[in-house]
Amino acid sequence: LGAKMAMQRALNSAGLRAGDIDYINLHGTATRSNDASEGKAVADVFGNRVACSSTKGWTGHLLGAAGITEAIIAMLAVEHGFVPGSVNTQHLDPAISIDYRIENSQAEVRRVLSNSFGFGGSNSSLVLGRKT
């Protein structure tokens, strides 16, 4: 519930709807508990039409620096027009109904939602993008 609320509040704060987001940088810790709950929350808010990936496989879990690192990657996706793939993903859970990308791909990315869900329920979602 906390992840879903964080994403909805980020959209509301930015004056956007779910359809305005082109890419979601998932918190994506590669644990069953986190990935299943985050995947369900993303599906509830966005359905399965928004490209999603986790970039923690590139950097490892940087704890307190994870959020800013993922925000930088999100802005690079906007600047360079790509969706970063999730490295080291071996199989996808068919119960998680989102558009999860394992390969880098070119795309027009105007707005990104970046999730950071901390220990003990500290949930944050940040909307980043081009000024329109």
Which residues are covered by each model-predicted region?
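Conserved "HGTGT" condensation-loop signature of ketosynthase/thiolase-family condensing enzymes
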Residues: 1-132
